[in-house]
């Protein structure tokens, strides 16, 4: 990596966890560059290292602790931030400092100010920061053609299996003008896809009572429907996509369906359902009802037949009976969800679900997860097969010797399927990463599509 100035202090950065944590990392790196710090691609080339951690499940905790240990071994000066920074062990002690007492500082998630204060303490900032080196859209860790747009922080739900509210706090919605300005800067920089994220996108603005803000001289409510409409209008000026994630199936989501049917935003919803049996949902403390959800899904598809629905579920939750699990399998088959992920229940330290009776053996949880995925993949394969012979708009993510790899409107990066594109048969059909291309679909399996331009 080339150096802009050999005099500038260098910071190494490790980012772990979900897209929301990735946005936190982008904000920290943007501020570091704004203050004149350089970002080092190696531990050895850095004056100190910042590690943004994940603490949601045991595997993520261990990955974060391992990353901290590696940074300490390779560099020696480490500042830790992120969700694991807010977690305590059974004795009430900070998990990170009890395992790695030599870290310089520890903060929780969404702690830009605290991280920068720690950096300033251990690596004073340059006297003449090069503000002009930082692009208006900030420093991004995603490929340049797509970006995550975080609209709020925290969550008002208290699901029994989750500890995110204890780490990230209650819902705090970003001002609508601030969100729109960030979106505009990203689109001006060439981003082709905005992925709207939060802990609960449907609840955007609840905490400020849907306060009216202003954007480009016109009033705009701090509310999901109005924000999504404005983002769709803005993205249309650049020929870009807007994709919605973490959307709870509240009645207000019905208002977004016409926007999807009209092509203003992608006909795609990431809806975290988790289960379908009412008793399991009750134990999970989830705000959902399977019958109402089925009715809502049918109504959505009537308005927008092209709608793709992705969701995640938990198999083997404490107390889950075979009958309750079968209800979940029946729901998956009936709802015909396009994209589905499933986790075998794993206890999370600090979650109230740990105190529920009826914990299931590991082998039962894993067996149910496998059965669930068999059903889900059959549904997905049927729905994907319907696309064979159609021509889809595809955003190219990568080009290699075998052709291209991209995504359709039904595929979010990292979590959904891919479209494998044959090499162009003629020079005028060439494409590169970040291009939109029309792809005729020639084949499908349970997850991916194949086609040609």
Curated annotation (Swiss-Prot):
- Start and end of every MTTase N-terminal domain? 9-124
Where [4Fe-4S] cluster 2 is bound, by residue?
155, 159, 162
Q: What GO MF annotations does this protein's record show?
A: 4 iron, 4 sulfur cluster binding; aspartic acid methylthiotransferase activity; metal ion binding; protein methylthiotransferase activity
Ranges for domain Radical SAM core come to 141-382
* Binding-site list for [4Fe-4S] cluster 1: 18, 54, 83
Which UniProt key words apply to this protein? 4Fe-4S, Cytoplasm, Iron, Iron-sulfur, Metal-binding, S-adenosyl-L-methionine, Transferase
* Compartments where located: Cytoplasm
Q: What does this protein do?
A: Catalyzes the methylthiolation of an aspartic acid residue of ribosomal protein uS12.
Q: What is this protein called?
A: Ribosomal protein uS12 methylthiotransferase RimO
Cofactor notes? Binds 2 [4Fe-4S] clusters. One cluster is coordinated with 3 cysteines and an exchangeable S-adenosyl-L-methionine.
What's in the GO CC field?
cytosol
The record ties this protein, via SUPFAM superfamilies, to:
Radical SAM enzymes
Reactions it catalyzes = L-aspartate(89)-[ribosomal protein uS12]-hydrogen + (sulfur carrier)-SH + AH2 + 2 S-adenosyl-L-methionine = 3-methylsulfanyl-L-aspartate(89)-[ribosomal protein uS12]-hydrogen + (sulfur carrier)-H + 5'-deoxyadenosine + L-methionine + A + S-adenosyl-L-homocysteine + 2 H(+)
**Primary subcellular site in the record, as a coarse category:** cytoplasm
Cofactor(s), names only, from the UniProt record: [4Fe-4S] cluster
| InterPro entries per the UniProt record, alphabetical | Elp3/MiaA/NifB-like_rSAM, Methylthiotransferase, Methylthiotransferase_CS, Methylthiotransferase_N, Methylthiotransferase_N_sf, NA-bd_OB-fold, Ribosomal_uS12_MeSTrfase_RimO, rSAM
């Amino acid at each position: 990596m080339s150096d802009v100035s050999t005099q500038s202090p260098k910071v190494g950065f490790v980012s772990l966890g979900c897209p929301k944590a990735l946005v936190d990392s982008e904000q920290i790196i943007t501020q570091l560059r704004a203050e004149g710090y350089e970002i080092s691609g190696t531990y050895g080339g850095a004056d100190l290292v910042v590690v943004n951690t994940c603490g949601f499940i045991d595997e993520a905790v261990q990955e974060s602790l391992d990353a901290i240990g590696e940074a300490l071994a390779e560099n020696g000066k480490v500042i830790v931030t992120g969700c694991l920074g807010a977690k305590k062990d059974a004795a009430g002690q900070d998990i990170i400092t009890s395992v790695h007492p030599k870290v310089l500082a520890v903060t929780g998630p969404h702690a830009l100010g605290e991280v920068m204060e720690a950096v300033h303490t251990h690596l004073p900032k340059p006297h003449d920061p090069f503000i002009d080196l930082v692009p208006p859209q900030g420093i991004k860790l995603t490929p340049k053609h797509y970006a995550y747009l975080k609209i709020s922080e925290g969550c008002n739900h208290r699901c029994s299996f989750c500890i995110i509210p204890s780490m990230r706090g209650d819902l705090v919605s970003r001002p609508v003008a601030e969100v729109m300005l960030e979106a505009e800067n990203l689109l001006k920089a060439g981003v082709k896809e905005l992925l709207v994220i939060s802990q609960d996108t449907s609840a955007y603005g609840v905490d400020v009572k849907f306060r009216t803000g202003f954007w480009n001289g016109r009033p705009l409510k701090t509310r999901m429907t109005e924000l999504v409409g404005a983002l769709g209008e803005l993205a249309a000026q650049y020929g870009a996509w807007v994709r919605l994630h973490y959307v709870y199936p509240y009645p207000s989501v019905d208002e977004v369906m016409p926007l999807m049917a009209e092509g203003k935003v992608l006909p795609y919803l990431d809806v975290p359902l988790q289960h379908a049996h009412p008793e399991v949902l009750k134990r999970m403390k989830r705000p959902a009802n399977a019958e109402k959800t089925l009715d809502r899904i049918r109504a959505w598809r009537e308005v927008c037949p092209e709608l793709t629905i992705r969701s995640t579920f938990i198999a083997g939750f404490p107390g889950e009976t075979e009958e309750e699990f079968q209800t979940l399998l029946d729901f998956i088959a009936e709802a015909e969800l396009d994209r589905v992920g499933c986790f075998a229940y794993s206890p999370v330290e600090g979650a109230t679900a740990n105190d529920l009776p009826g914990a299931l053996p590991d082998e039962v949880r894993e067996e149910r997860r496998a059965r669930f995925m068999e059903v889900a993949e059959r549904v997905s394969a049927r729905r994907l097969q319907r696309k064979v012979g159609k021509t889809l708009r595809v955003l190219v993510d990568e080009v290699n010797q075998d052709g291209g790899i991209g995504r359709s409107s039904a595929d979010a990066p990292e979590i959904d399927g891919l479209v494998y594109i044959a090499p162009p048969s003629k020079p005028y059909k060439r494409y590169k990463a970040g291009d939109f291309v029309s792809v005729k679909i020639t084949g499908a399996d349970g997850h991916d599509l194949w086609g040609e331009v």
